[in-house]
């Protein structure tokens, strides 16, 4: 095949041969590999046949460059493989037909000439002709194995005579033999055995069935070109009564001839295919036969191997063989990395040949025409060291560890074993193991044994520091299934933290192994083309284990007892949740996500879990010395605690402490608030408490992080070199309250909580999904749910928008997440909790004429900026060099567009994405009150919007800068239009303020006992409302970010009391979580937010367990504004969250630039 490139795409073309009846049958054409390309070039290369299936014509050939290889290989496929749906039959090294790189020796020159004939004389090396233009011998060599067996005894006798002649042969003759480039190797016949056949049946099959499975590469290698002709190593087998050893001969310097250490293989038979006289391999074949006879008849012979000069063979310790008595064994060559070779038909062992092992390959320099190239990396070759002696040992047939003597040096030994492990994993990844009778169990067991040996080497004190990168071999083991069937009443179970492994929560190593330098090396290596198959395999196994764990999951009717020491009885749904929590702490990973609707008593449920496990530990009196066994060897914890670390927003730390004091008997649980400037930082003291409560901000402050750790699994994060007591303690349990605070995996808080060490991990949140599926990934990373805590695998296997990804997400949520809503019914048809009625009231408002005029000015300017941005965005495409699918930018900017470039100057107007979103924010403020336009955007409020503006952008973000003029004026100019100054005064009643006051007055007239909660995302809006409430004589209190936690709890208690204030003003971000405002039954949402879950959280401040009155939720929407469009976007986000939490696995909808078009009517 020639090197033909497509003139349009520049890629190598495929060579296509017509095989159907018609005018093009037997003709060949070069065609571009791109589906849409029409490039075709005819050629006169004749038809050739497949090396695997010699009766079938090769219909497709292509030059491909395997990953991590420097030379192209010629891949081919015949019509048989095409009919079977296979990608390729195999590949051979490719060299340009015009190349002049031939061997120096005469015989090698002849071989080179036969291999590198011009394309118009012979098409590729599939049908190699000898120097007399006659068909090659390989077809004759593989047939008639029965005749070979008959002549076996005669050949051995002849071999003795030849051996004597060989001993007398002169050095010059030996040198001539060496010049041919052949390295004699033992040969084997192969046969497929059934697992149940033993004894006489095996012997019988050995006599009759070994012909059809001969390894074709063994034959092919006899006729290769170059000065280093190699053949795949095979092994010979003695009868059970004989003891055989491998032999290596040490020759003199002028006639160095090296034979490979050939371990005995299981059931291999010593049959030799003898070539015809006069064949080009006759002399070398005779020498090989003589050496084999010597190996049989001689006693224990010392096997030595001299170090070879460059250009000679070096041993490739990739695979191994195992001695056992019996008949012939089936053997196969592993497929080329990344390519499915006949679906691995001959690449992997199965139960049909259970007692055999992989082929030991003799690797040659690149370019040797082995059908499958399996050469070592140059660096690996240089590091290999081999012993001078070879000792045969008998091991179990399924052993995955080579039983040849490995290098005594730990460095070389690990390289030696790692090389074997890589090949076996490559074989496993390239094979459809589901098609094998034993599902690939034998190969998996071999990989596990190799990993165990390598794990032992990693822990060895002899290991040098320079070996760290090589020692990090992925660990894989069988899953363990929990078989304990849940009783109708679940007893408390102790934390199973003894003897378990936190790294790889599903007993699988994370898909990403992280080196000390911070770089990641993905599972089974990014460097192989089979990485996709490897990722698919580990993902499927992890999902399968989670799915199987559901078999032991407690049903809806299963409840747990109230723990001793709890003052208040648990409600039915809380008892059911406690049963589920206890079950999850016995699974992998230990812990999960409690995502009950807000107001269902998640705090009390978690307190009950802590109390239950404490009571159980006291009963069993477990020794503290064994508590660290669940930690990874990399974890550096100084103290072990049986306590729980609770991390929550600052506003809730006193709430947690008060709940424990009110709900639990005194002296049952010791609680400590790790907060404030005078906190106790002694790790030994903190480890003695049952509960330690701290805040997200304090954790982020004390635990150092860097941005590169955002995509690294939590188990691999570096925790060294820090003195914070939180990291020095191995906790029994960590609880993240309001866990949506870590929804962005890139922020410091999220990375910091993932570094903490604990046996069980819990994420408690009523809204686990707020924006997109990345929120869910962040929680899984905290839970250390491998392999899904590795970001690249999460994106490729789950968050990929495919149906399969949705199914995987469904399994994850069903296994790890418990979600109940207030309106959910139990098995008897009754609601989970008895709550009063809740009614939503939507108030449609019409802006006043002045307000509408101001709004239209802003809208026109913002719409023009968006149109300009969309034009530039569409023309530029993705030429910015960033991935448009970067999830972190999707979180920051909920429309999936680009991050702001802070280095750019603020244009007038600058049509950046952030600027457009800030203009949208101003439009929403127009709908509330025009006085909001006077102030610059508050950085805290911008953070809630997901916006980050520079100082210059904040000052120029459409504020009424004209108001700063020194000359007093009764009008103000906005974008060329003049408005009255009084429109922007805080005391002026806007449309929404007027409607709000009317509703409040109506509530007071109907019932003086009813109270109201008013929510806004802007603190300035709350100040405006407060002015008007005071003007109308209504008492109020305000909770925003400026109120400290202690004052906040006092204000809540006062509001819930009958004599407290009539109205509570809360900001959406500061007061939207953790507050119990059941004293009020009316809630007013003054403005619209992109994130509907934030509004739902605010609504649940009053609609929760403990509410005695009917609840009314008021929403204000101005007609003809963006608020109407925001309602549509909120529904999209709610649908996304509903699909994920229900585990429906439906396709997810992400917000895009199309939503911006909808908002502005473009």
From Swiss-Prot:
Enzyme Commission code: 3.6.4.-
Keyword line: ATP-binding, Cytoplasm, DNA-binding, Helicase, Hydrolase, Isopeptide bond, Metal-binding, mRNA processing, mRNA splicing, Nucleotide-binding, Nucleus, Phosphoprotein, Spliceosome, Transcription, Transcription regulation, Transcription termination, Ubl conjugation, Zinc, Zinc-finger
Helicase ATP-binding domain residues: 583-786
Motif DEAH box per record, residues: 737-740
InterPro entries assigned: DNA/RNA_helicase_DEAH_CS (IPR002464), Helicase_ATP-bd (IPR014001), Helicase_C-like (IPR001650), P-loop_NTPase (IPR027417), SNF2-like_sf (IPR038718), SNF2/RAD54-like_C (IPR049730), SNF2_N (IPR000330), SNF2_RAD54_helicase_TF (IPR050628)
Binding-site residues for Zn(2+), renumbered to this chain: 6, 9, 32, 37
GO biological process, one term: DNA-templated transcription termination
Biased composition (Basic and acidic residues): 142-178, 246-258
Subcellular location: Cytoplasm; Nucleus
Gene Ontology, cellular component aspect: cytosol; nucleus; spliceosomal complex; transcription elongation factor complex
Zinc finger map (GRF-type): 6-46
Biased composition (Polar residues): 105-116, 219-232, 261-274, 459-485, 877-888
Cross-link (Glycyl lysine isopeptide (Lys-Gly) (interchain with G-Cter in SUMO2)): 143
Annotated spans, Disordered: 97-116, 142-358, 388-407, 459-503, 871-890
UniProt: ATP binding residues: 596-603
Pfam families with a match to the protein in the record: Helicase_C (PF00271), SNF2-rel_dom (PF00176), Zn_ribbon_GRF (PF06839)
GO MF entry, a single one: helicase activity
Residue positions where Phosphoserine is found in the record: 460, 883, 908
Residues of the Helicase C-terminal domain: 995-1157
Subunit structure: Interacts with CDC5L. Part of the spliceosome.
Stated family: Belongs to the SNF2/RAD54 helicase family.
Protein name: Transcription termination factor 2
Species this chain originates from: Homo sapiens (Human)
Gene behind this protein: TTF2
